[in-house]
Amino acid sequence: MCIRDRTNTYELTNDMSHLEEKEIFLESTSSMVFDRVNRIVYAGISPRTNAVQLIIWCRHNNYELVLFETESHTGSPIYHTDVLMYVGTEIIGICFDVITKEHRDYVKEKVSTYHDVVELSPEQIEKFCGNAIEAKNKNDELYLILSSTAYKALNEEQIEKLLESYTNIIHSDIPTIEKYGGGSARCMLTELF
């Protein structure tokens, strides 16, 4: 099902689908990690995250852009920004080690301006620790949602720090999504709530 089929459910405000034919991509909430409170978009450049389209999108929507390059253990850029980081109301989880040295200090400064930081290791993001998402219940209590694979990869100190910002950490075992889909909890929820 393509985006045009969704227009009867969601209002299409900016159709960029024509760029697909030119293999220019900006894969929304996977390519762009949003700090909606402070109107900042964090994005790592990759074949799925076109820098020019990202700049245009941020200008059009009045978001500050924090653009950086990444390098995975294979030497390639990390395909989606939501693999290496998530943004919550009070806290950000991020793997600085996969951000190139030229951009690392800049990103560290930006993320720590408005948030506490939980640093993730490259091994932890391979276990989907960066692919988490914050949600709020009807009582305005904040929760962090991630997979059981990710939860088990967090250390005790990280869990304690997260529980200072969250009522609880919700996790579920989703190995099929992680193995065959290449994503985890955040990819499944995609901020459509």
What are these regions (language model features)?
Residues R4-F193:
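The feature marks the mature, well-folded catalytic cores of soluble enzymes
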